[in-house]
Amino acid sequence: MAVYGIVATVLVLLLLGDASDVEATGRIIGGSDQLIRNAPWQVSIQISARHECGGVIYSKEIIITAGHCLHERSVTLMKVRVGAQNHNYGGTLVPVAAYKVHEQFDSRFLHYDIAVLRLSTPLTFGLSTRAINLASTSPSGGTTVTVTGWGHTDNGALSDSLQKAQLQIIDRGECASQKFGYGADFVGEETICAASTDADACTGDSGGPLVASSQLVGIVSWGYRCADDNYPGVYADVAILRPWIVKAANAI
């Protein structure tokens, strides 16, 4: 699993003392094509006219994504592509009016890695563009979840078409234990972990949705290497962060 974004480089140096395995771009490993009408809440966040991160439709005006995707970036450079099978064409491209990153976001450890943005014009919902409900309880260990995004595929190239992969939730305590390679300092109380043999999500998928039973349970945050059994994917826990999401969405 690659580290999801340049902001996590310090984290890798602290964790392993060696940044040689850091990948500048990542991928959904072991994924398959996902029709946008089967994940109509998925969006592509574009910065300087290219895909930067995934995002999730919360309402006609609000998108949820990872904090590190927007942190200290200029809103004038941001647009969101919605209702598109491909990140680089189709659907509707909407400018961003404003965004808010969680006040406790930590770019060093990627704790509280959550943000919301407000679109300049409201979306029109349809088969390929729709909001998703937020989970009210954190998923238990062993829950099957689906992650989607346009990150690089197994051949190392950015995927033009939306991809999906099925994973299983790993209990937070287990993820932070010596069974895996992170430790308690890196797996915060506001995170959940998920993994599967030969399947994973990485950099280009940051900010995208982790879904169970048609509810948003997580936001792709960070990890190390791709589909490495010792390093599960780490996601912002939507149930834990739900009060902040609702408040920020109403205030922005």
Swiss-Prot record:
Stretch forming the signal peptide: 1-19
A GO cellular component annotation in the UniProt record: extracellular region
Gene Ontology molecular functions: serine hydrolase activity; serine-type endopeptidase activity
Alphabetical keyword list: Disulfide bond, Hydrolase, Protease, Secreted, Serine protease, Signal, Zymogen
Predominant cellular place of this UniProt entry's protein: secreted
Site (Required for specificity): 200
Catalysed transformations (reactions): Preferential cleavage: Arg-|-Xaa, Lys-|-Xaa
UniProt cross-references to CDD domains, sorted A to Z: Tryp_SPc (cd00190)
Keyword Manganese: no
SUPFAM superfamilies: Trypsin-like serine proteases
Cystine pairings recorded for this chain: 53-69, 175-193, 202-226
Domain (Peptidase S1): residue spans on this chain: 28-250
A Pfam family matched in the record: Trypsin
E.C. no: 3.4.21.4
GO biological process: proteolysis
Subcellular location: Secreted, Extracellular space
Active site: 68, 113, 206
Keyword Signal recorded: yes
Family: Belongs to the peptidase S1 family.
This protein's name: Trypsin iota
Organism: Drosophila melanogaster (Fruit fly)
Gene name of the encoded protein: iotaTry
